[in-house]
From Swiss-Prot:
Organismal lineage: Eukaryota, Metazoa, Chordata, Craniata, Vertebrata
Protein name per the record: Proline-rich protein 12
Modification type Phosphoserine: residues: 332, 340, 651, 865, 1077, 1135, 1308, 1381-1382, 1387, 1568, 1925
Transmembrane segments: none
Post-translational modification N6-acetyllysine, affected residues: 1223
Compositionally biased residues, Basic residues: 1199-1208
Origin: domain of life: Eukaryota
Organism: Homo sapiens
InterPro entries for this protein: DNA_MethProtect_Complex (IPR052466), DUF4211 (IPR025451)
Length: 2036
């Protein structure tokens, strides 16, 4: 092994192969996956051999980072230690930046990561692992995470390798071949031998499990045997385990976790294997993971999917990010839990984690169900995190009862873990096992790292491990009992695990229960970092980060992920921390890794620092915290050193934010203390002590720290939440075992929660500078006293953090809030119930914190308890709920289950429930976190993978578990389903799935378990299980009964809660829902029944989602998931939110949906609604949930009801108000959503009285106020056209906008009013989705709106949702736009058009079963159906229900009847209103980031979402609202387009409002913006029937149908891909005949060539017809443009029409014609009304524009317009539109729709051309130019120049010159190859210059000599004769400079005679200089390009040519400068040629 180790190969392969692969592979994550997989298999073997062996430990981390770096930078591997951080950071940044492209990109990234990771760490298991990792990356979303995971894993692996050197060896070969078998066996073998007695079996198991996990992951089956071999138990479990493992494998972490040591490595391998498994794991997946994994697999790369899925799962469950590990966790529930059984199997001892976990608290249960939870949680987690996880899970599982410890098992600590049993036990054992067991440490390389590090410290731990082991054994002996006693034992265990955790051990040894948890905590922090990383990745990472981060952390890596997850899982954290913390080495490593994963760095760093430091700190610190200040310190030192060492290089990068955190390793450590133990809390000692005392706190701290660490608080939070959940679970489990344990756990959580909150807060702070400050606070918080303090301080930070976390990007706030809430809540809950002593303090702090947190979030705390509840309700609703979406229900569910009811019902249930309350709350809280995590990638993948896995898992292994769990579940079903107790677990389980979900399904499941603490609750988990909380489920299966009692109390709530959990699943649950969920649903159904209404709403939401989702989602599943994921991910910033949202929506709906999924769906307000609208609504809920995190839960519940666009939003707003702080977070969305949701929910009484009433009141009040406001404003709005528009709105179209306006009152007062009405109606009628409009919004729009909102918000609101939302939105936009038509007549015409559009959209949607189409279809058709259904049923209810809405609705119906004919229109029109919500969503995201104020900033985010409209909307939402509303829909897509793009991670590409199809877009002659060169010669076509789908897909970012290049009589197929988030098409070798009537079946499409790589052409579809035809189109465009201009914002609407451009085209043309024909008239007309009702006119205009421009690059325009509009609108919300319109009018003349063009080119220069840009200025005008052309088409080159086409051409020209500067032969080569990319632009520009030169020449009389001189010399000196001199009127021209070759621009070698002087007339001198400048312009520009390249090359080391060119081209200011000088030159030439 060592020998392998040495092989730097790992580094190389890692770095090189994988690392760089990412870049290259990024494009094809799949490729990477496959490639990686294939290549890695062999390569990896080698790599693996070395890599793993590689001193990953110290290096691994780095390596990982390096891997990451590698990802980023092939050289990364060389980056090794220093690189890691950077690389990670790079990775993260890359991931984030590429978030959109996540799929491949992320994949590849991850892949890179992963590969390296595996290569690195898992080399041994590498192949599989790597593959898995790779595969993981495969899962688009996951990739990042996966990569991270893998990436991180290496660290753990690295460590692991040590321990597993032999193993590695074994693994190496065997691994390679069997990948899993060997891995497993070898793992087992190695481990076993390594492990020694207790450990052996455990280890063996663990190893086995790990290996098995891995194996299963890798081999699944093969592994299974090995796995089984380990323990007899395993066999059955193997299935599970495999599943688990698969999950794990997928999770890799699971495996890794499971085998933290070797396995960990392997685990990573596992994780890695996961991916490969997909290849090969697929079968395995089939086996176990298959369900889960397969879904993952389902993701693009099946292999990745597993990991992904796992991670997803994890993420979901384990905070997605932890994903890998967490995935395990999450998976655990799924497979882990299921695996739980697997774990359980392991529990039996197999997966030590499971075993341990099972053994731990639930040795039996775990095995049975507790194990499931622990095992499942632990098991699963274990699987995923087997070691770490388990460990963590131990922490988690430990919490789970050590079941979690399966992770420990990973280290064999399982037994220990088991032994530890307690979380601590699990932990300890996990850790110990991992650490100790690994000798475990040694063994648990992953752990080892940590272990090693810790071991380092102790190995002590290593030894400690043994000791731990012994301890563990003790525990082992009494794992179950330890569970009770485990806390302390856990601590001891912790100790044990600590070894893993080392610190844990140290501390654990301390035996402080807290320490255990602390360890967890540590793990968590670690996890957090992971998370952080994840978060960094946010979507991918986030998802992954968690898994990843954890991985990273877990990597020290695996552990990190594991523990991160675990930490998330809390115990897992512990376990993981070992990875991370334990890893002193890993910690170091982790740190490194974490740091490495810079994303983690902050968190990681922090975490790491904390993890490393904190780790150390955490582990150490944690442990320290735990109490062994000394050892920890020691460890810290050591670890710190390592970490620092590792981290340092890497950390610093990460450290930036985290650095402080991490960077501080020591300090950070201390600082991290917080993270680490309070670690950074400056007072490491204190924190430590505190930690000790308050390990929970510490834990939380850890968690929080994690969060904090997490920059990506979201993930961190999630993770934290998960961790907490886990911890909770653990606690509960433990608690169950022993209240104390619980307390510990809980306390951990509680304190942790607080801490978490603090940390979260802190976390964000880390992200923000505040973080650091905050950190101390959190620190303090950590400290008991600090608690309150922290809260105080925290609150502010939390928002930050929250935002950070939540939004991760834009949505952090919500996320944070959610997280905070969850954390806090859980803390409180936990604290309250558990906090006996420490807990209580924590609780107070928690409450305080919570309160502060809430407040900070905008949640208003109520009573602490109530507040908690409310918080849960509110916060959760607001922030969390958003997360929870249904989470609210979730919280209730948890609350209900445990505390769910408390949430709604009160805390009693929670309390009654047995600490469940806290748990419940906690769970929910966690859930949000989890959710956050989950949604990211998880959602999609999960949906895809998740479901299958669930089903399979449930069906198969899961089924077993499930059966187990099933009955209990059934029992608990009520509990889970309806019963709160189960609910929480369910939630939890879902949590794992959707970490944010319930308490964290996987991890959370454990958390839930904690909730259930209750193992019973775990059963609830079972409920969750369906979600994929199998682990939890199984885990909980046993406990279901206990939960059942709670269920009753919490039924109402619980349903929601349960629902939430399920919802969680729902995220991806559809399938899960169907499967696992089914039980849940079934069981839950009844309980849910009460809340049925709520659920109906929620359910509807869920159900809808489920139904729609299932069909659409599932149908779209493959694509849609990715899309969704992308969607979720797409909004990286949003991602967190999205994640959260996603989860929540799903959760809410999910649970219900799950339950609802059952037919009971109808249960909720009406199945129909659920079916039709709900589905949409769910989206909205998600949106609401996501966007209105705070409100969401409330919203979620409410939202379902108030899913309507405005309504939900508004409710949210109310909610927001209610959660005032939250509001800021989500303000728009939040508030509206909350308000709406709240109102609606309230109406429905979502399940939280608190929630309801609060929400209701607030919502209602708010809504009413808003309505009033709107109404007041309405008169204005109503003026003239506005009035008609208002009617239109009333009809529903604009309602949402109104609502939105309501949300953002400014948004659209008029709109607001109508929306208000709907809102009101909706509110009352939320279930029905009150007004038809709303309902349709809910349905058509709800989905769309919700989606939009969510998407806009970047909520993951449901990845599924987002997609749906997107589709729906798109559809809606289409429909709405047309229907929106600004005018009544327009309306009518548009109605027709709309119908057409809708039909086309629908057909498109239907056509492409793309998620979009499907969803859209669903929205359109189905939404129509749902909308229809909604409109039908909902409308009916809506009408009645929606008081106002009803009225508006009828109008809508009436007005939209034409559209309505296609019901979709009505719904669609209604959808427009939803768009407003989306808009709010947009704003919301910004709000997430900031409230309305934020909204402007967010607008950017949102703007992207609603490029034109949104952007205006956010700032001028009020004014923009109306506009925004309709546009919003489009905007939403648009926003999604932009937002998604960035955010959209893997599967969804950036949105494009439309596609330039010949005939449809010709009128818009604008140049198509964007990169690439239009080659006139090439003709591309698309099937006519695919056009709508294409447009829809482009708008939603989903996968479009293929396009074809005409090659004479053949058509060459170009298939869609995503690169850098951008949708592009790659040439394939598939051809079709193109002759005869085939030619009639295709329509020409305009594309631009992007590049030719490997002889493959890559093109992108233009949104507008390329510039090649600008003149004519320009003119036409001018006219159209004027409207466009006027309605630049309107661009978004066009987007909508875009989908059905064709149909719309006619209408467009027709309806447009009037406007077009009378643009001025029309324009003016709208302006007048516009003034009164700007929005409307704007919207109208937009619509018109849309119409006019139709598909014109609305997007670009939108963006531009958004930009412009934004400023304009911002300036005057109302005015902008008006001004805009008027402006538009002038613009009209100039025809400059600055917005449009500006988008791409003027992003920076936007200001110029923005609002006033002026025709030329606005030259975004380019298109405008067209307008200008009318003036003088060619007259003003300047103007022409400013066109987008010209800009693109010029950009290409500069790129060519830059390339020439780097390669002198470039131009010649271009000529020789007849390059079509650069030559045409060059020739055009040269021709332009020559043309002007000739014109100038006409004014000159040049002598041949002078002309020759001017031509020869590039410089010209002009000397004016002085006065009095004879030549007074003359000027001397002195040509100078070095002559050059005009063609190649290279200097002439021959000497040229020196130029003489020439005298010319003064008046003519300007002509000479102008002529000279024109002649030499190319050379002069070339020289400037050369200077630029030299500057870049000078500043960076060996950059490749490509990189230099890219950097130059990214220098927008420089490009603008060049372009401006070029424009000026031509303008000058023009002026001179005219006069003279």
């Amino acid at each position: 092994m060592d020998r392998n180790y040495p092989s730097a190969g790992f580094g190389d392969p890692l770095g090189a192969g994988a690392g760089w692969s990412y870049e290259r592979s990024a494009k094809a994550s799949l490729v990477y996956g496959s490639s990686r997989t294939s290549h890695p298999e062999t390569d990896i073997l080698h790599r693996q051999a070395y890599a793993a062996p590689h001193p990953l430990q110290s290096y691994a981390t780095n390596h990982h980072p390096a891997g990451l770096s590698g990802l980023f930078d092939t050289g990364l591997h060389h980056a090794g230690s220093a690189g890691p951080d950077a690389s990670v950071m790079n990775l993260i940044s890359a991931l984030e930046s590429r978030g959109p492209q996540p799929g491949p990109s992320a994949s590849s990234l991850l892949s890179q990561f992963r590969s390296p990771s595996w290569q690195t760490a898992m080399h041994t298991p590498g192949p599989t692992e790597l593959f898995i990792s790779g595969a993981l990356p495969g899962s688009s979303t996951f990739p990042s995470s996966s990569a991270l995971s893998a990436y991180q894993h290496p660290a753990s692996f690295g460590s692991r390798p040590f321990p597993v050197p032999s193993s590695l060896s074994l693994q190496d070969p065997p691994f390679s071949p069997p990948a899993n078998g060997l891995l497993s066996p070898h793992d087992v073998l190695h481990l076993k031998p390594s492990q020694a007695p207790t450990v052996p079996s455990s280890l063996g198991f663990e190893r086995l499990a790990g290996g098995g996990v891995l194996g299963p992951a890798g081999l699944g089956p093969a592994q299974t045997p090995p796995y089984r071999p380990g323990p007899p138990d395993p066999p059955p479990p193997p299935r599970h385990l495999p599943t688990q493992f698969n999950l794990l494998a997928s999770s890799s972490a699971a495996a890794a976790a499971a085998e933290q040591s070797s396995p960990q490595l392997y685990n990573f391998s596992g994780a890695a294997p996961g991916p490969p498994p997909p290849e090969r794991a697929l079968p395995r997946q089939d086996t176990v993971i298959k369900h889960y994994q397969r879904p993952a697999s389902a993701q693009p790369p099946p292999p990745p999917p597993p990991a992904h899925a796992l991670q997803h799962y994890l993420s979901c469950g384990g905070s997605y990010p932890s994903m890998g590990h967490r995935a395990n966790l999450a998976c655990s529930p799924l497979g882990g839990g299921e695996p739980s059984p697997g774990a359980g199997e392991p529990s039996k001892a197999g997966p030590s984690g499971a075993t341990a976990g099972a053994s731990g608290r639930a040795t039996g249960p775990e095995a049975a169900g507790g194990g499931g939870a622990g095992g499942g949680g632990g098991g699963y987690r274990p699987i995923i995190q087997s070691p770490g996880y388990k460990t963590g899970k131990g922490g988690y599982g430990a919490a789970a009862g050590g079941a979690t410890r399966p992770p420990p098992p990973r280290s064999t600590a399982t037994p220990k873990c088991q032994s530890l049993g307690g979380p601590a036990a699990a932990y300890a054992t996990g850790k110990a096992s991992g650490a100790g067991g690994a000798g475990g440490q040694a063994y648990s390389p992953g752990q080892p790292q940590g272990l090693l590090g810790p071991q380092a410290y102790g190995q002590g731990f290593g030894g400690g491990q043994a000791q731990d082991l012994s301890k563990a054994p003790s525990y082992s002996g009494g794992p179950p009992q330890p569970p009770s006693g485990p806390p302390p034992p856990g601590l001891a265990t912790c100790q044990s695990y600590s070894p893993d955790q080392l610190q844990g051990q140290l501390y654990g040894v301390q035996g402080e229960p807290y320490p255990g948890p602390a360890a967890h905590s540590q793990g968590l922090p670690t996890a957090s970092p992971s998370l952080s990383y994840s978060t960094g990745h946010s979507p991918a990472l986030s998802g992954h980060g968690g898994g990843w981060g954890p991985s990273s952390l877990g990597g020290g890596g695996e552990a990190s992920p594991s523990h991160i997850i675990r930490p998330l899982q809390s115990p897992p954290a512990t376990g993981r921390p070992p990875g991370v913390g334990s890893p002193g080495a890993p910690g170091k490593y982790l740190s490194s890794v974490l740091a490495s994963a810079p994303f983690l760095a902050p968190p990681g760093a922090g975490s790491y620092a904390a993890g490393a430091g904190g780790y150390k700190g955490k582990g150490d610190g944690s442990e320290l915290l735990a109490g062994p200040g000394g050892p920890p310190a020691e460890r810290t030192e050591d670890e710190e050193f390592l970490i620092q060492h590792l981290l340092q290089a890497p950390s610093p990068p990460r450290t930036s934010g985290a650095d402080g955190l991490v960077g501080e390793d020591g300090a950070a450590d201390a600082s991290k203390g917080l993270g680490g133990s309070g670690g950074a809390g400056g007072p490491p000692g204190t924190p430590y002590e505190l930690a000790k005392e308050d390990p929970q706190r510490y834990h939380l701290q850890s968690v929080i720290r994690t969060s904090a660490s997490l920059d990506e608080g979201a993930t961190a939070a999630l993770e934290l939440g998960l961790g907490r959940l886990k911890e909770k679970k653990k606690g509960p489990e433990r608690g169950g075992e022993t209240p104390e344990g619980l307390a510990t756990s809980v306390v951990h959580y509680g304190a942790g929660a607080k801490e978490l909150g603090a940390f979260l807060q802190k976390s964000p702070p880390p992200p923000p500078p505040t973080a650091q400050s905050t950190q101390p606070t959190p620190h303090g918080l950590l400290l008991e006293a600090g608690g309150p303090d922290l809260p105080l301080v925290l609150p502010p930070p939390p928002p930050q953090l929250l935002p950070s976390v939540l939004s991760h990007a834009p949505s952090p706030s919500p996320s944070a809030s959610k997280v905070g809430v969850h954390l806090l809540e859980p803390a409180t809950r936990d604290g309250a119930p558990q906090p006996p002593p420490p807990p209580p303090p924590p609780p107070p702090p928690m409450p305080l914190q919570l309160e502060a947190h809430l407040r900070s979030h905008g949640l208003e705390p109520a009573a602490p308890s109530p507040r908690l509840r409310p918080e849960e309700s509110l916060d959760p609703p607001g922030a969390m709920q958003e997360l929870l979406g249904a989470l609210e229900p979730l919280p209730p569910a948890p609350g209900d289950t445990g505390v769910g009811p408390p949430n709604s019902e009160g805390k009693d249930p929670a309390g009654a429930y047995r600490s469940p309350s806290p748990q419940g709350t906690k769970a929910p809280r966690f859930v949000p976190l989890t959710s956050i995590c989950f949604p990211d990638s998880l959602l999609q993948d999960e949906e895809r993978s998740f479901f299958p896995t669930m089903e399979e898992m449930f069906g198969g292994g899961a089924a077993d578990d499930y059966g187990k769990a099933g009955p209990p579940e059934d029992e608990g079903d009520p509990k889970a389903g309806a019963g709160p107790p189960p609910g929480p677990p369910a939630y939890d389980p879902y949590g794992p799935y959707c970490p944010g979900r319930a308490s964290g399904a996987g991890p959370e499941t454990p958390g839930l378990g904690l909730d259930p603490n209750k193992p019973p609750e775990l059963p609830s988990t079972v409920n969750a299980e369906p979600l994929g909380l199998i682990q939890s489920g199984p885990h909980q299966a046993a406990p279901p009964p206990p939960p059942p009692p709670p269920p009753p109390p919490a039924p109402a709530s619980e349903p929601k809660g349960g629902l939430t959990s399920p919802i969680f699943c729902s995220t991806k649950p559809k399938k899960l829902l169907k499967t696992s969920s089914f039980h849940l649903l079934r069981r839950r159904d009844p309980p849910f029944q009460t809340p049925k209404k709520l659920y109906a709403q929620e359910y509807e939401f869920e159900a809808d989602e489920d139904k729609a989702d299932v069909p659409a989602d599932i149908r779209l599943n493959p694509r849609r998931l990715p899309d969704l994921v992308s969607s979720c991910r797409s909004r990286p910033a949003l991602s967190p939110l999205g994640d959260i949202d996603f989860c929540p929506p799903n959760p809410g709906p999910d649970g219900p949906r799950r339950r609802g999924r059952k037919p009971t769906k109808a249960k909720r307000d009406g199945p129909p609604r659920p079916r039709g609208r709900p589905r949409i609504r769910p989206l909205e809920v998600p949106t609401t949930a996501g966007p209105a995190s705070a409100s969401t839960p409330t919203d979620g519940a409410k939202k379902p009801r108030g899913r309507g666009r405005g309504r939900g939003r508004k409710a949210e707003e109310a909610g927001g108000t209610r959660l005032e702080p939250l509001k800021p977070l989500k303000i728009k969305l939040s508030v509206p959503k909350a308000g709406e949701g709240l109102g609606t929910s309230s109406g429905d009484a979502i399940s939280g009285t608190d929630h309801n009433s609060l929400d209701s009141s607030l919502t209602r009040e708010k809504i009413e106020a808003k309505i009033k406001e709107v109404e007041e404003k309405q008169p204005e709005m109503k003026s003239g056209f506005m009035a008609s528009f208002l009617d239109f709105l009333k009809s529903g179209k604009r309602h949402p906008p109104l609502y939105q306006a309501g949300l953002t009152p400014p948004l659209s007062p008029p709109k607001s009013v109508p929306p208000s009405v709907p809102a009101r109606g909706l509110q009352p009628q939320p279930p029905a989705t009150p007004a038809v409009p709303h309902p349709p919004p809910s349905g058509a729009f709800g989905l769309g709106g919700a989606l939009e909102a969510a998407e806009s918000e970047g909520l993951g609101l449901g990845c599924p949702s987002p997609c749906k939302r997107l589709d729906e939105e798109l559809k809606r936009n289409l429909e709405t736009l047309p229907s929106f038509s600004s005018d009544e007549e327009d309306s009518v015409a548009k109605n027709r058009d709309l119908q057409e559009s809708i039909s086309s959209a629908i057909s498109a949607l239907d056509d492409p079963p793309l998620a979009g189409p499907k969803d859209t279809s669903t929205p359109d058709g189905p939404p129509l159906a749902p909308a229809a259904a909604v409109p039908g049923p909902p409308p009916l209810p809506g009408l009645p229900s929606a008081n106002s809405n009803g009225t508006p609705e009828p109008p809508l119906l009436e007005e939209k009847p034409p559209p309505t004919p296609p019901p979709a229109p009505t719904p669609q029109p209604q959808p427009p209103p939803p768009p407003p919500p989306p808009q709010p969503a947009l704003p919301s995201p910004p709000p997430l980031v900031a409230p309305t104020p934020s909204s402007p900033p967010p607008p950017p985010l949102p703007p992207p979402p609603p490029p034109a409209m949104p952007s205006p909307p956010p700032p001028p939402p009020p004014a923009a609202a109306p506009l925004a509303a309709p546009p919003e829909e489009p905007a939403a897509p648009s926003p999604e387009d932009p937002e998604l793009p960035d955010t959209r991670p893997l599967h969804l590409a950036k949105k494009q409002e439309t596609a330039a199809v010949c005939g449809e877009t010709d009128e818009e002659a604008g140049e198509s913006g964007g990169e690439g060169i239009f080659r006139e010669r090439d003709e591309f076509v698309i099937r006519a029937e695919d056009i709508p789908s294409l447009k829809l897909a482009l708008q939603t970012g989903r996968e479009p149908p293929p396009i074809w290049r005409v090659q004479k009589a053949l058509l060459q197929k170009f298939t869609p891909e995503i690169k850098d988030g951008q949708r592009q098409f790659c040439a394939t070798s598939n051809y079709l005949g193109y002759f005869g009537d085939a030619k009639n079946r295709y329509q020409r499409l305009y594309v631009k060539f992007l590049e030719n790589v490997n002889k493959k052409d890559y093109v992108r579809v233009c949104a507008r017809k390329p510039w090649h035809r600008p003149p004519v189109p320009v003119r036409r465009s001018g006219q159209a443009k004027n409207p466009v201009s006027a309605g630049g914002s309107s661009a978004p609407p066009p987007k909508a029409p875009a989908p059905p451009p064709k149909p719309e085209t006619p209408e467009k043309t027709t309806s447009e014609k009037p406007p077009e024909q009378t643009p001025e008239t029309a324009m003016p007309e709208p302006p007048a009304p516009e003034k009164p009702s700007l929005l409307r006119p704007v919207e109208k205009e937009k619509e018109k524009e849309k119409v006019t421009r139709g598909e014109r690059p609305l997007r670009g325009e939108r963006a531009t317009s958004g930009r412009q509009t934004r400023p304009e609108r911002s300036l005057a919300t109302g005015q902008p539109a008006t001004s805009r319109l008027p402006k538009a009018r002038p613009t009209k003349v100039k025809a400059e729709p600055p917005p449009k063009k500006r988008k791409k080119w003027l992003k920076e220069a936007g200001g110029n051309a923005t609002a006033g840009g002026g025709p030329p200025g606005s030259s975004s005008d380019s298109e405008s130019s067209p307008g200008a052309p009318s003036e003088d088409e060619r007259a003003v080159p300047g103007r022409l120049l400013k066109t987008r086409a010209m800009r693109e051409m010029y950009r290409s020209y500069v790129e060519m010159l830059v390339s020439t500067a780097l390669d002198p032969d470039m131009i010649q080569a271009l000529e020789d190859t007849h390059d079509e990319l650069y030559l045409p632009p060059m020739r055009k520009i040269d021709g332009l210059l020559n043309e002007h030169k000739k014109k100038v020449l006409k004014r000159l009389s040049l002598s041949p000599a002078l002309q020759d001189a001017l031509h020869t010399f590039p410089q010209l000196q002009v000397e004016q004769s002085g006065e009095g001199s004879p030549e007074e009127g003359a000027v001397r021209l002195r040509p100078a400079g070095e002559p050059y070759n005009r063609k190649t621009l290279s200097k002439l070698k021959r000497s040229v005679v020196r130029a003489q002087e020439f005298k010319v007339e003064l008046e003519k001198s300007g002509y000479y200089t102008l002529y000279h400048s024109l002649h030499h312009y190319k050379y002069h520009t070339f020289l400037r390009c050369r200077d630029q390249t030299l500057a870049i090359e000078g500043g960076a080391e060996d950059l490749g040519q490509e990189e230099v060119v890219q950097q130059c081209m990214r220098n927008q200011p420089w490009l603008e400068q060049l372009f401006d000088s070029f424009s000026d030159l031509l303008a000058q030439a023009q002026a001179h040629s005219r006069c003279g």
